[in-house]
């Protein structure tokens, strides 16, 4: 950091998909330094130094939020002295550097107004409301800012996790969690435009993101039966198990293993074209892999990733549909 400049940034990305997000980041911003990936429970975070215009970073599809790192505090204690140390550090922030970073965004930003959000992850003897009240008062009284609303102002976020606190300035509009997840999954599949895609997961908001970002020729969404009646604005939507598909029709499948795995794998083998790729979110991984080996379905496992969602651990299994027998590859119902 030099005078009146912030060069340290933080990306908030889907948990378990941090490396996918980092791959997109390196593609967009080639001059990165001091990259640090911190996996998390619901979200992961990527910290990095970038000395060029942040405008290039605002269009990242894999991130829920992009923020400039204003200050980082360590050894934060759980009692009132910890809150006091946070407040003392906020008093010393370089407001000119914060305002300069905010003005680097496109459009007009009111750098005299602010909004503040706070998250606490851990057990403390001070509340979220106490932190917000104390920090807001400092921003008003010490730094001369006024409170406002909307997105065209200084959007401060204070994150307190364990014994560390981060004060950041959020930049850009960000993406919904659904959109970021959908992009990362499609990037893992190396999805091409004008493809035929089957989506059979749980968050139907992912469908709109896939349609907007990848423009498939066919986007078919199969909702779990408990989601019957859900409002979906894009693609063809049906209830899983009620819409037959032509064999070999689909190029890519994004699925959540929720039913009988043998039936699901058999249907996956039937509808995927030779060379087609599927990404399946699986909770009982060992059982799933065991059935693939036992039943000898025509798939090869390309990759396995860990994923945490709503407090539960899953694996993302990337499968390619084989077109011929290869004894060197793991295969999953294939008769010759």
Protein language model regions, located:
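Non-catalytic nucleic-acid substrate-recognition regions in nucleic-acid-modifying enzymes
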Residues: 2-148
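Core SAM-dependent methyltransferase catalytic element
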Residues: 47-50, 306-336
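Conserved alpha-helix/loop element of class I SAM-dependent methyltransferases that forms part
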Residues: 177-196
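Conserved class I S-adenosyl-L-methionine
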Residues: 193-205, 209, 220
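S-adenosyl-L-methionine
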Residues: 224-243
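A short acidic, Gly/Pro-enriched loop at the edge of an enzyme's catalytic core
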Residues: 240-254
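A short glycine-rich, Lys/Arg-flanked "PGG" loop and its adjoining helix->strand segment in the class I
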Residues: 262-274
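Conserved beta-strand signature within the Rossmann-like core of class I S-adenosyl-L-methionine
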Residues: 275-283
């Amino acid at each position: 950091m030099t005078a009146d400049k912030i060069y340290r940034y933080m990306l908030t990305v889907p948990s378990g998909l941090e490396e996918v997000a980092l791959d997109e980041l390196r593609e967009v911003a080639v001059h990165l330094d001091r990259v640090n990936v911190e996996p998390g429970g619901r979200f992961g975070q990527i910290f990095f130094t970038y000395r060029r215009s942040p405008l290039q970073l605002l269009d990242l599809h894999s991130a829920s939020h992009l923020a400039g790192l204003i200050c980082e505090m360590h050894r934060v204690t759980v009692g009132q002295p910890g809150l006091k140390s946070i407040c003392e550090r906020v008093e010393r922030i370089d407001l000119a550097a914060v305002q300069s970073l905010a003005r680097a965004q496109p459009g007009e930003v009111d750098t005299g107004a602010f909004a503040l959000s706070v998250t606490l992850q851990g057990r403390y003897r001070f509340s979220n409301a106490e932190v917000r009240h104390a920090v807001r008062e400092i921003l008003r009284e010490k730094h001369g800012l006024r409170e406002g609303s909307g997105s065209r102002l200084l959007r401060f976020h204070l994150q307190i996790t364990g014994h560390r606190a981060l004060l950041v300035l959020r930049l850009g509009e960000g993406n919904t969690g659904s959109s970021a997840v959908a992009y990362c999954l499609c990037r893992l599949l190396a999805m091409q435009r004008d493809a035929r895609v089957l989506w059979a997961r749980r968050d139907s908001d992912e469908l709109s993101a896939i349609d907007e970002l990848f423009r498939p020729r066919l986007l078919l969404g199969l909702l779990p039966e408990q989601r019957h009646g859900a409002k979906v604005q894009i693609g063809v939507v049906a209830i899983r198990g009620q819409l037959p598909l032509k064999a070999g029709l689909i190029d890519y499948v994004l699925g959540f293993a929720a039913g009988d795995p043998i039936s699901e794998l058999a249907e996956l083998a039937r509808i995927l074209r030779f060379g087609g790729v599927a990404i399946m979110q699986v909770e009982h991984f060992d059982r799933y892999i065991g059935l693939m080996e036992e039943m000898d379905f025509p798939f090869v496992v390309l990759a396995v990733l860990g994923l945490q969602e709503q407090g539960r651990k899953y694996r993302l299994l990337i499968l390619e549909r084989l077109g011929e027998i290869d004894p060197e590859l793991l295969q999953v119902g294939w008769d010759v």
